[in-house]
Regions:
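Non-catalytic signal-transmission and effector/linker regions of two-component phosphorelay proteins
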Residues: 1-6, 111-117
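N-terminal first-folded block
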Residues: 5-45
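Short beta-strand/turn micro-motifs composed of small residues
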Residues: 10-11, 48-50, 77
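Conserved phosphotransfer microenvironments
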Residues: 47-64
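Conserved phosphotransfer cores of two-component systems
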Residues: 65-69
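Short beta-strand elements of ligand-binding domains
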Residues: 72-78
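Alpha4 helix (beta4-alpha4-beta5 surface) of REC/receiver domains from two-component response regulators
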Residues: 80-94
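Output/docking surface of receiver
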Residues: 92-104
Length: 117
């Protein structure tokens, strides 16, 4: 039996994680969520919620980049928070998307990554 492709989420927002989980599940991709980066599995696509606990999540991006150098690390936050987007990129994020674009971005990036067939 083949393993279900997985995408990871570092965050605790139930509404955003539910939206992300639903979008990915429709394409046969499982979302593995964890409140701390040391609990995330080794996957090639990681989403990081920058809407809360911002400083800790920025530090987590740096640790994730060190541990999973080739992973696509995607932060998400309010579209107007340009400074946070810049800081996330400086910390090692591959890109940062607006909250409202999260489900679409997840499907697009999972397809590029090869997670979605």
């Amino acid at each position: 039996m083949s393993e279900v492709p997985r995408v990871a989420l570092l965050g605790a927002d139930l509404i955003l994680s539910s939206r992300l989980r639903s979008a990915l599940a429709a394409r046969g991709v499982a979302l593995v969520a964890a409140p701390k980066d040391d609990r995330l599995p080794d996957v090639s696509l990681v989403f990081v919620d920058l809407n809360s606990d911002t400083e800790a999540r920025l530090e987590a991006i740096g640790r994730l980049r060190l541990r999973h150098g080739g992973a696509m690390i995607v932060g998400f936050c309010d579209h107007a928070d340009r400074d946070l987007r810049r800081r996330a990129m400086a910390a090692g994020a591959s890109q940062v998307v607006a909250n409202r674009r999260l489900p679409d971005a997840a499907l697009r990036l999972a397809a590029v990554d090869g997670t979605v067939r």
